[in-house]
Amino acid sequence: MITLEVDLGTRSYPIHIGSGLLDRADLLAPHVRGQHAVIVTNETVGPLYAARVEAVLAGLGKTVRTVVLPDGERFKHWETLNLIFDALLQAGADRKTTLIALGGGVVGDMTGFAAACYMRGVPFVQMPTTLLAQVDSSVGGKTGINHPLGKNMIGAFHQPNAVIADIDTLRTLPPRELAAGMAEVIKHGAIADADYFAWIEDHIAGLNACDTGLMAEAVRRSCEIKASVVAQDEREGGLRAILNFGHTFGHAIEAGMGYGEWLHGEAVGCGMVMAADLSHRLGFIDVETRARIRTLTQAAMLPVVAPDLGIDRYIELMKVDKKAEAGSIKFILLRKLGSAFITTVPDADLRETLRHAILKPPTEAPVA
């Protein structure tokens, strides 16, 4: 097992990475101090892993309740969030009750938001079961739900008490979900560590095959990068925005297609290709770097050609973004591989990138 720390002073917390961690009572016990624990999971993950976590908590003498949510991004809204609140109130949960997010990014985001809101804040633990959640969304305290007009526009910063990432759970992921997680792995190399990006290029076949050793290293290095950024800028006042590389385009794809049509990681992967193209058009990266990002994204089984929402529709959607200021769209671009920054861009260059990225006719269908 590897243990990292997110250094936030009195709110610091561990990230445990390894095999068999779902059964480790010693990892959960320090963070479940009250009598009640509520596991939040979904219809897919619950049947696979909930009983194991319930057994650990029961062994600690805790009263356990499990809430099973519908599975998918399209359910990341108020009505589903209220299922968690209903369960907490029906169980008589108090301020010492610990919520446990057992699932992927949607479960983690919603559980964290519920924990932030219930009685104005209760503790929660992240137990991510998808690659995307293990390398990205479980770390950093961003929680929330979607709105029809924009992704993650309603939420709160609420740090978990711990992250327990059992890499054995990755073996049950469908290939599409595994690929979606690889988008965030690639992102971390692109924005912060060129050597890590090269390592991903060298090991992409093994990563696609979910090799245990390679996955453990990818989760470790990605969490190190994200933890370092979060420690320097918890509330996304500046540096932390670089973690949104590919997300401005990606969120527009998700909203424009309808939440759940594209997985978050698929949209981010395509968004990174678009952001790399925009970085090149503005003279920041060379054609080789742009090609490396596209090639690696495609090798990770992610889409590299965007759906045709219409250029004006893309721009409309991107204006509903947390980074936008006074109607100006902000993008995370690359100065070079391993170095990112936030900026506005000329409208003409943005439109040219969108024209270049949009899905071609069926005779020129993209490789996803």
Curated annotation (Swiss-Prot):
Tell me its cofactors.
Co(2+); Zn(2+); NAD(+)
GO terms under cellular component: cytoplasm
- Note on how the cofactor is bound: Binds 1 divalent metal cation per subunit. Can use either Co(2+) or Zn(2+).
Gene Ontology molecular function terms on file: 3-dehydroquinate synthase activity; metal ion binding; nucleotide binding
Binding positions for Zn(2+)?
Answer: E184, H247, H264
**Family stated for the protein in its record:** Belongs to the sugar phosphate cyclases superfamily. Dehydroquinate synthase family.
Record's protein name: 3-dehydroquinate synthase
Record organism: Cupriavidus metallidurans (strain ATCC 43123 / DSM 2839 / NBRC 102507 / CH34)
- Per the record, the gene is aroB
